[in-house]
Regions:
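Active-site acidic catalytic loop and adjacent metal/ATP-binding pocket
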Residues: 358-405
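Conserved beta-loop-beta/alpha segment of the NTase-like Rossmann-fold superfamily
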Residues: 57-58, 62-134
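Conserved HxN/HPN-centered segment at the entrance to the catalytic loop
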Residues: 246-261
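Active-site activation/catalytic loop segments of kinase-like enzymes and analogous catalytic loops
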Residues: 397-456, 472-487
């Protein structure tokens, strides 16, 4: 089967999320819409039709999907869901079946062709602009009852021989020709649509796990499962960490009910960035003290000799490897000076500045590893109504070392949320206003904790320059972990800003 994804159009219903990228690159539940679609068809020939922000789409596919058989088709002046379809059909063999679908659909499984000229997929899961009635007539009526969702399988390209260069596939060509076709209707329940800006923002706010995990909440317990065997080792590292710190009587964790099912006590509490308007400055200081004291308690449980190679892997190799992955997506990457929100900053990845950057990284040495959490951002601990701190989702490893690592990294990750507003980037509460080959302008929603920077530095007992440098590396590393285009740009800018505070 050949897969044709209609990814044209500006996606204006998604507001700021499509200002700088086509809608197929919008993230949903940890993956871009495009990634979700092509992963269902990894052994098929895939054509992606694009127009808006075409260079971004082209570079993105080259960066992240080089292992797939993908061809991108740029429409030339044509509009509507038919635009680019004729161009794609010219590249398909006469007898091959075809899947044609819109890029903003989220399908939790493959679609298969049934013997017919055309199979029209309908759904009752969300509102569609057109529906298919019992006589297989296309009715212009906003409906969630047999709504035409924007996915079709076609026997072969000869069925589509009369499609025009532009216009609407559903209300135009299909409606005009449906009486001449052998049509099958298939209603499916495993389809979702991204929809509008408010729906997408709600999704970002309510996401509780990464795409390879599932979290099930019961009244008094939480069960965590790995959905992808490739990531099972992360769950194993997490279990190992809980066992070790529990054995050493660390109190600031939920009780583990079962390691086999990975079921733990449910802690009722709040994340710091979600309660910022309800807590006074004095309360925030007291809560930050308790978080800091809990980290000190964790770090004091046990120590081992540090691994120099692990330090190099985490601070140097991971940073440079991840930037290498996405550098072609960053339009200002090659600029020696980058104007960020109206101020000029030196770019440490410019060849003339890289040696100085590397020298700073190489000085990040330590003789001792402590037991660490590895990722104590706001999302990974809860504050109860009694202002107790409970950590969860530990990293469980520091490169090759399990459970132990550089305690400075924990403090840097806390700074990442408190001062860096990482959680606003993670939840897409930001906007990239403009960018070009030498500049970027962005706005980032505050978590309301930045004023406690000096208090946090003092609490950590770590040199401020070291925490800033580690945060610089964390933001740069985050670039290569991300798949959201705007987040990549902002994360790189944040890394550059931090570097210029210490260089």
């Amino acid at each position: 089967m050949n897969v044709i994804i209609q990814a044209g159009g500006k996606g204006t219903r998604l507001g700021r999320h499509t200002k700088n990228k086509p809608k197929c690159l919008v993230e949903f539940e940890g993956k871009t819409l495009l990634q979700r679609q092509i992963e269902n068809y990894n052994n098929e020939k895939i054509f992606i039709i694009g127009d808006y922000k075409f260079k971004v789409l082209e570079d993105y596919v080259a960066t992240f999907f080089s292992d797939y058989d993908i061809e991108i088709i740029k429409t030339t002046g044509a509009t509507g869901t038919l635009s680019g379809l004729r161009q794609a059909l010219q590249k398909i063999d006469n007898d091959d079946s075809i899947l044609f679908m819109w890029s903003d659909l989220v399908l939790d499984g493959r679609l298969h062709h049934k013997n017919s000229d055309i199979q029209i997929f309908t759904t009752n899961n969300f509102l569609c602009r057109y529906r298919l009635d019992d006589d297989s007539k296309i009715i212009k009526e906003t409906s969630a009852n047999d709504g035409i969702m924007g996915a079709f399988t076609i026997r072969d390209k000869n069925v589509l021989s009369s499609v025009p260069m532009a216009g609407s596939f559903v209300s135009g060509w299909l409606k005009d020709n449906i009486d001449k076709l052998d049509v099958i209707r298939t209603n499916i329940s495993f389809a979702r649509e991204v929809g509008e800006l408010k729906h997408l923002d709600r999704e970002f706010k309510n996401t509780t796990s990464r795409f390879f995990n599932s979290i099930e909440f019961a009244e008094e317990e939480v069960t965590k499962k790995c959905l992808d065997p490739k990531y099972e080792h992360l769950i194993d590292d997490e279990k190992r960490w809980y066992k070790e710190v529990k054995k050493l009587n660390f109190k600031n964790i939920p009780d583990i009910i079962s390691y086999n099912l990975f079921k733990m006590e449910r802690i009722v509490g709040n994340h710091c960035h979600q309660k910022t308007d309800d807590w006074s400055l004095e309360q925030k200081i007291e809560i930050l003290n308790k978080i800091g004291n809990a980290l000190h308690s964790l770090h004091s449980l046990s120590t081992v000799e540090a691994s120099r190679q692990d330090l190099v892997d985490v601070y140097k190799n991971k940073t440079f490897d991840r930037i290498k992955l996405v550098e072609k997506l960053i339009p200002f990457f090659e600029s020696k000076d980058i104007n960020i929100n109206g101020t000029n900053f030196k770019n440490p990845f410019h060849p003339s500045l890289r040696d100085e950057f590397l020298l700073k990284i190489e000085k990040l040495n330590t003789d001792t590893f402590n037991i660490i959490h590895g990722d104590p951002t706001f999302n990974n601990f809860l504050i109860t109504k009694d202002e107790e701190v409970f950590f969860f989702d530990p990293r469980g490893s520091f490169s090759q070392t399990k459970v132990y690592g550089d305690k400075r990294y924990d403090w840097a990750k806390l700074y990442y949320s408190v001062v860096g507003n990482y959680d606003s980037v993670n939840e897409k509460r930001f906007k990239v206003d403009n960018y070009d080959s030498h500049s970027i302008s962005y706005t980032l929603e505050s978590n309301g904790w930045e004023s406690l920077e000096q208090h946090l530095i003092k609490l950590s007992k770590i040199d401020r320059h070291q925490i800033l440098l580690l945060n610089c590396l964390i933001w740069f590393s985050f670039c290569g972990y991300l798949r959201d285009y705007d987040s990549i740009l902002v994360s790189y800018a944040k890394g550059v800003e931090l570097w210029n505070q210490i260089c």
